[in-house]
């Protein structure tokens, strides 16, 4: 038998008819395997054989053969009880059958001799195991053979039974065939006799049945056949012809009656159907007419209700708008009164010279009041905008409802269309007015007044007799103006020299006339915002929203902590910062020494040209006394304080990335700012002194190169912020393009950090504090001396500066206390401006714009002549009074620690 991998695969069973499987001698199925008692029954198969099925067709092949494991112990008592010789002599196969499982599947490997306890010989064990495997294989072969034999026997029995059934059927068929043959013979005989009769010509005596195929030789036979086989037809035939006629007449009468009844019923049904349809049509017409009348009534009611609602909404909106406008006008009048009062008090304070503490408290109260007014205005403007949006939303909903009944309210729709046309016409007129006003503003901005700096002669170095800056006073009503118009350098220089006082006066008159229009500021602001958005979108800059104050604070605290950890842990980082700061300081010195000295003609007269079409901010005339005023040419003599003219643009500035420059340039500038600021802690006092002197001289040289600036008050703020490098971070001249933003500088905020002599107080910033102390120690011995020809650019009292916001810019606001909301981050600039420096004693509230329609920003530094400066020319430790609304997390400026 075939084996593979110790598994037996038997051959297929032999086809029926062969006796090879039956003829193979078996150990247990042989005739000698019968018990000695003489019983003729077959022995049962071995215990390994599975259950057999009843039929050969359903008999399944036994599972594949596999040798079993031997785990059973040897039952020596049963084996000792067997007499092997007797079994061999008597051929007792029954005893072998009883012990075959125990012998075949027992394990003798662990058996030992009972006497000496020695293990069994391995050769003997091998022989015994071989015998066990042979017996197991023979048992499996026996099972397979018995199964195949039983299946063959079952098939044989089934075929025998089928053979018997076929034999019985065959006998029945033969008998039926014999009977059919006899019947066929008889029919043939009858047919032959009938054909013979027909052919003999005896058709006259032939009578055929009309209802069947039979024919009779005699009429009597046919009649008897009719009575016997067709009785109904026979009775009908016996009836007379009269009876048939009478019956047909009756049937015809009944048919006629039924037809008449049918016609009558159909006519009645038709008339009823016509009446019913006519009635239904009348009812339907009446219902339609009634529905139309109800629909018309409903349409009229809806139309009246909608019109009443629209009128109510219009009246409510008009009342709200009137109340808001009235409140706004009241606030504006109060603001103007407060400003005039502040100006008068400032003039009185200049004459009386009150102490610094009372003036600071007074100005703090003024700033707080201004902030409150600004917040109220923002609040009311937001409410007004919300009400307008609600009104527009309700109006749209009402229009949608009106569209659903457009057939009934066509007149109302026409009226609304006329209103829309009128509004569009008004809007076009307003746009035309705005464009014309923009043109006028541009013309006016191209002709700014000439502002001359007059200073008094100083005979003593005492602080009380310092020369004050005397400038022309302008109107307080400064508003938003048109976008920036860039001029070439030659045009700037030529136009700045050729302007005269008459042009200044005419320019101021035109400005005042234009600003009398109350809706001008709002219209110009909207136009400026649209122009800025379009310009930014054309340049590929998408609109961004600024960070909130809480998010900014949390981000900056995390950045500062990470930066400090990095400085403490990594010495290489500290060393690299020192090296870079030293290199930057050297570059600053080289750049400052290379600045050319301008001609004295430009130093005599400081002319201001607005950077944009915005008007100059409010300027207060400051007088130090009745001393004679005369124009003197400032001499570039080194001074103890870096008091520079109003138009100076010193290198002590934080260069800022232009609004439309690449991110790589801005990142480089930020890195250089950080490195230069951190290098300030390592500078020696002597180096700081030299830097200040060089900056003051170069600032004078750059004075005449500036051809566009803001009003004189803004210039004084610029001079103050540039005088102490630890207080203000200014913008580079290259920032002021058509798409750049204008900054808002509150002069009162700056004067809160100054004393009576115009010197800046110490701030909380560590670098600023150290640098300020070093400068004070070096300059303490010199006292309050002012060099000959010097000009004091610091105002004794703060002036109210309102910056004009340009149409193409969004405002930058000062950093405030915790009450600042997300409105401080509404700028869409890409620049990072460090936060404002706070004083050491107490946080002074800063001024916010009082009126967004009036709150405008002006250029702090004027023309773009400083474009030659590279990013990174920043003063070490310079803090900022401005805060950008867009703060990047990667900003490494030291001023962020404030």
From Swiss-Prot:
One of its GO terms (molecular function) is zinc ion binding. GO terms for cellular component: centriolar satellite; centriole; ciliary basal body; cytoplasm; non-motile cilium; nucleus. Pfam families: Dzip-like_N. One of its GO terms (biological process) is regulation of BMP signaling pathway. A zinc finger (C2H2-type) spans 207-230. Molecular adapter that recruits protein complexes required for cilium assembly and function to the cilium basal body. Required for establishment of left-right asymmetry during embryogenesis. Acts as a permissive factor that is required for the proper regulation of Hedgehog (Hh) target genes in response to Hh signals. Acts downstream of the Smoothened protein to modulate Gli activity in the somites of the developing embryo. Belongs to the DZIP C2H2-type zinc-finger protein family. This is Cilium assembly protein DZIP1.
């Amino acid at each position: 038998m075939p084996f593979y991998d110790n598994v037996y695969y038997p051959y297929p069973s032999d086809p029926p008819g062969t006796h090879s499987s039956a003829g193979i001698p078996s150990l247990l199925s042989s005739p000698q395997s019968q018990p000695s008692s003489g019983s003729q029954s077959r022995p049962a198969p071995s215990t390994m054989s599975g259950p057999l099925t009843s039929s050969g067709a359903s008999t399944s092949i036994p599972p594949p053969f596999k040798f079993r494991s031997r785990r059973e112990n040897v039952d020596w008592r049963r084996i000792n009880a067997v007499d092997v010789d007797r079994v061999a002599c008597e051929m007792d196969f029954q005893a072998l059958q009883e012990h075959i499982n125990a012998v075949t599947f027992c394990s003798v490997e662990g058996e030992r001799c009972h006497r000496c306890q020695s293990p069994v010989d391995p050769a003997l064990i091998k022989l015994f195991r071989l015998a066990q495997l042979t017996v197991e294989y023979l048992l499996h072969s026996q099972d397979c053979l018995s199964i195949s034999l039983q299946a063959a026997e079952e098939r044989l029995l089934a075929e025998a039974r089928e053979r018997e059934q076929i034999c019985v059927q065959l006998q029945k068929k033969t008998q039926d065939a014999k009977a059919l043959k006899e019947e066929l013979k008889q029919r043939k005989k009858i047919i032959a006799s009938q054909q013979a009769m027909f052919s003999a010509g005896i058709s006259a005596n032939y009578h055929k049945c009309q209802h069947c195929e039979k024919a009779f030789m005699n009429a009597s036979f046919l009649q008897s056949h009719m009575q016997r086989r067709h009785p109904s037809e026979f009775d009908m035939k016996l009836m007379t012809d009269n009876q048939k006629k009478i019956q047909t007449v009756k049937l015809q009468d009944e048919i006629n009656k039924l037809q008449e009844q049918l016609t009558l019923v159909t006519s009645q049904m038709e008339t009823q159907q016509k009446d019913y349809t006519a009635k239904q049509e009348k009812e339907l017409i009446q219902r339609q007419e009634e529905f139309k009348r109800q629909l018309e009534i409903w349409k009229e009611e809806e139309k009246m209700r909608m019109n009443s609602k629209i009128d109510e909404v219009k009246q409510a909106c008009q009342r709200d708008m009137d109340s808001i406008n009235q409140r706004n006008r009241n606030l504006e009048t109060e603001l103007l009164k407060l400003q005039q009062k502040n100006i008068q008090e400032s003039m009185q304070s200049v004459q009386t010279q009150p102490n610094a503490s009372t003036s600071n408290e007074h100005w703090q109260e003024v700033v707080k009041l201004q902030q409150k007014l600004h917040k109220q205005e923002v609040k009311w403007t937001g409410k007004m905008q919300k009400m307008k949006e609600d009104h527009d939303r309700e109006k749209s909903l009402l229009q949608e409802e009106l569209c659903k009944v457009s057939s009934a309210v066509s007149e109302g729709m026409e009226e609304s269309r006329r209103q829309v046309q009128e509004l569009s016409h008004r809007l076009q007129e307003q746009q035309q007015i705005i464009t014309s006003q923009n043109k006028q503003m541009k013309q006016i901005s191209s002709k700014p007044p000439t502002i001359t700096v007059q200073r008094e002669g100083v005979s003593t170095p005492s602080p009380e007799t310092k020369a004050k800056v005397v400038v022309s006073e302008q109107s307080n009503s400064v508003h938003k103006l048109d976008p920036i118009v860039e001029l070439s350098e030659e045009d700037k220089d030529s136009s700045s020299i050729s302007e005269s006082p008459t042009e200044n006066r005419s320019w101021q008159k035109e400005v005042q006339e234009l600003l009398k229009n109350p809706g001008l500021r709002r219209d110009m602001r909207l136009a400026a915002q649209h122009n800025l958005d379009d310009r930014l979108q054309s340049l590929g800059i998408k609109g961004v929203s600024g960070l909130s104050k809480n998010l900014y604070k949390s981000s900056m605290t995390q950045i500062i902590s990470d930066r400090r950890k990095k400085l403490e842990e990594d010495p290489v980082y500290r060393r690299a910062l020192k090296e870079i700061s030293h290199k930057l300081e050297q570059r600053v010195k080289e750049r400052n020494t290379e600045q050319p000295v301008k001609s004295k003609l430009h130093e005599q007269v400081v002319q201001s040209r607005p950077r944009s079409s915005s008007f100059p901010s409010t300027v207060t005339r400051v007088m130090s006394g009745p001393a004679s005023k005369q124009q003197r040419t400032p001499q570039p003599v080194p001074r103890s304080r870096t008091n520079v003219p109003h138009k100076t643009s010193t290198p002590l500035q934080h260069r800022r990335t232009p609004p439309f420059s690449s991110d790589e340039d801005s990142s480089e500038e930020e890195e250089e700012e950080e490195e230069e600021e951190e290098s300030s802690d390592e500078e020696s006092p002597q180096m700081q002194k030299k830097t200040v002197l060089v900056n003051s001289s170069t600032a004078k040289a750059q004075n005449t190169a500036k051809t566009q600036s803001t009003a004189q008050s803004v210039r004084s703020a610029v001079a103050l912020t540039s005088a102490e490098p630890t207080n203000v971070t200014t913008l580079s001249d290259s920032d002021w393009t058509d798409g750049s933003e204008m900054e808002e500088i509150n002069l009162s905020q700056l004067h809160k950090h100054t004393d009576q002599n115009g010197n800046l107080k110490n701030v909380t910033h560590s670098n600023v504090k150290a640098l300020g102390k070093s400068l004070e120690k070096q300059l303490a011995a010199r006292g309050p001396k002012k060099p000959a020809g010097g000009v004091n650019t610091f105002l004794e009292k703060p002036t109210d500066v309102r910056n004009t916001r340009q149409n193409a810019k969004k405002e930058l606001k000062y950093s405030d206390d915790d009450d600042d909301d997300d409105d401080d981050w509404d700028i869409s600039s890409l620049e990072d401006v460090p936060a404002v420096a706070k004083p050491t004693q107490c946080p002074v509230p800063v001024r916010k714009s009082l009126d967004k329609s009036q709150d405008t920003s002006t250029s702090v530094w004027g023309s773009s002549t400083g474009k030659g400066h590279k990013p990174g020319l920043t003063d070490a430790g310079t803090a900022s009074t401005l805060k950008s609304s867009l703060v990047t997390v990667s900003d490494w400026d030291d001023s962020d620690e404030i």
